[in-house]
Amino acid sequence: RFSIPPRVQKDISEFNNDNPFKIIYVSTIDQYKHQWHVVTAVNSLRQKGYPIRLELIGPAYSPALKKLNEIANRFDPKRDWMKYYSEIPFEDLHKNYARADLGLFASSCENMPNILLETMASGLPIACSEKGPMPEMLQDSGIYFNPEEPEEIARAIYKLLSSKSLRSNLSKQSHELSKKYSWERCADETFIFLNKVKTSFYK
């Protein structure tokens, strides 16, 4: 479902207020996910005239949602360009990825982030947190930033927004890399299953 071939990238001149550059960030709204820093970063780019729309998707913890709403109310009180959806059925989520131009992941603490793998498989160029294990997974197929620094997030977004060729190359790289992880996970799960069968057989 999430394996979407990388699409043909548009030049920055093709984006406008009626057809904005769409960023998607799927993750739980939580303190270590830094959605408010992402909103701040996008606002700074919009203030410079770049037509960007931000879509945040995921359930929320109350304190973090309150913090997000405070920032959103300051920069986009009418929610013209920042959209938040608390729940989207998993079977429909791939449609949101398919409509996006850029995937973003700003977590500062993860184990094995499936959401990052989904974003990679969705054929999107990715701006990503520099905190581990994200660089180990995405390798050289993304543009990295410190998730606690809105200025760095903005620079990473702009680097991708401004370069059609960079977006094209990185989206192809990350999409291919996602296939490797899919096969590795399949092999690992098969190995675990066979071990369980073996253990049960010899009991």
Which residues does each PLM region occupy?
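A short, well-ordered alpha-helix in the C-terminal region of glycosyltransferases
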Residues: K159, L166-K180, E189-I192, K196
